[in-house]
Amino acid sequence: MKWLWVLGLVALSECLVKIPLMKIKSMRENLRESQVLKDYLEKYPRSRAHVLLEQRRNPAVTYEPMRNYLDLVYIGIISIGTPPQEFRVVLDTGSSVLWVPSIYCSSPACAHHKAFNPLRSSTFLVSGRPVNVAYGSGEMSGFLAYDTVRIGDLTVVAQAFGLSLEEPGIFMEYAVFDGILGLGYPNLGLQGITPVFDNLWLQGLIPQNLFAFYLSSKDEKGSMLMLGGVDPSYYHGELHWVPVSKPSYWQLAVDSISMNGEVIACDGGCQGIMDTGTSLLTGPRSSIVNIQNLIGAKASGDGEYFLKCDTINTLPDIVFTIGSVTYPVPASAYIRKDRSHNCRSNFEEGMDDPSDPEMWVLGDVFLRLYFTVFDRANNRIGLAPAA
């Protein structure tokens, strides 16, 4: 049995492609330094959980929350066109559309980012189909196009992507990325459009129909997206597999959330979404308020919760039980210290929806602790302690 396990690891790691991710200053810090954070949070109080509810109510519209990118610090580099034009993008498992700014974009936000020039690409094709992605702070509108997309050493031909003509105002002006590359299931995106990862598999560019994330908490470099395989040197022990409960988002069943052996949320089970496009741990408002009270976090006027920094050394782990396996999140992970040495809670309020089971979004706070494999071939998620 041991040899079968070793051979399985070899198969998973064969011919995989590693895409380095850059760790950067968060947009929240940019907004705070420009003294516009409070105004932004008051005007756009939407999180990924709000958008999940909106998308259920109107599945014909592609919704994306912009607030969930506020604390994002991981981006990757891709290129589009022939010769290649380079862009910094969020690699987002919570969406499935690829879009970047175009030179025809009239919004002030586009002036702060690299823009794709179709006239400089010999492989560019325009479809004429409009693209609209609704965000919490406005709407990205543009048009659909096709071109060669390169990610690492892999080249996808005739990839559909969106080119923006207008972008949401203040948020994208302060964004540290140019666009978004979605890694979610196809039904999250535009009807009839094949996402980038699906084309990597369909065009025979990767040996396994899966990808994995390793997010480093220490260095500017070291974080990694793995395409088509898994490198076991990035995690400890064995991967524990959990089935995807609803193949759209990378969604799974969570057994419970506990502290000091007592269930404090998700009593009787709930749903969780593994989301690289979300930085924090987001849950129903009632559950988050309870957790903030338990850890002694106090609300500020802008929706954030503050704690005394010395509590990092005294507060207990908060434990997520998934597939009967426990995944502790220590205080050093669920509390963050900013550049001004203020400490904030990494739990964020979503919303309560009486018509739906309790929904959580497990963002980078969780994913930094646990190496995560997204297995499309078997509709499952693998988790193991990160190395």
Curated annotation (Swiss-Prot):
The keyword Protease applies. Keywords: Aspartyl protease, Disulfide bond, Hydrolase, Protease, Secreted, Signal, Zymogen. Residues 16-62 form a propeptide. It is found in: Secreted. Disulfide bonds join 105-110, 266-270, 309-343. Expressed in glandular chief cells of the neonatal stomach. Expressed in yolk sacs of the placenta (at protein level). Residues 74-384 form the Peptidase A1 domain. SUPFAM superfamilies: Acid proteases (SSF50630). It catalyses: Preferential cleavage: hydrophobic, preferably aromatic, residues in P1 and P1' positions. Cleaves 1-Phe-|-Val-2, 4-Gln-|-His-5, 13-Glu-|-Ala-14, 14-Ala-|-Leu-15, 15-Leu-|-Tyr-16, 16-Tyr-|-Leu-17, 23-Gly-|-Phe-24, 24-Phe-|-Phe-25 and 25-Phe-|-Tyr-26 bonds in the B chain of insulin. Shows particularly broad specificity; although bonds involving phenylalanine and leucine are preferred, many others are also cleaved to some extent. May play a role as a specialized neonatal digestive enzyme. Belongs to the peptidase A1 family. This is Pepsin A-5.
